[in-house]
Amino acid sequence: MSAMVLPKEISQALVELTGEPREGMALVLLMRDYARHKLEEIDTALKQYEQTYGMSFEAFKQRWESQDREEDYAYARESDYLEWEALVTRRKRLETSFAWLP
């Protein structure tokens, strides 16, 4: 593991933001809070898609891949599919990347 030297201003900001005097632990706390915040944002967006379409992404994806519907070729629907899929992927990556955080 390599050591990281932070500028004094950043170190002070970390302490002020987290209340933790140890830089390393303060950075971990900040990362944890960031990950939680991003997950909350993603969950809000996911719920909006689920409410709009009345189903989970997995159900929507299965229907998308198995049925040929004219409305599925509309730009808005296709765009929603891609954005929804990106949110699901981003959520999984965040959960995996930050699973080690306390």
Regions found by a protein language model. Give the residues of each.
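Short, contiguous alpha-helical
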Residues: L82-T89, L94-E95
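Short, glycine/alanine-rich amphipathic alpha-helical segment
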Residues: D68-E83
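Small, basic N-terminal interaction modules of short regulatory proteins
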Residues: M1-R63, K92-P102
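Solvent-exposed, flexible loop/coil residues
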Residues: A59, W64, S79, A86
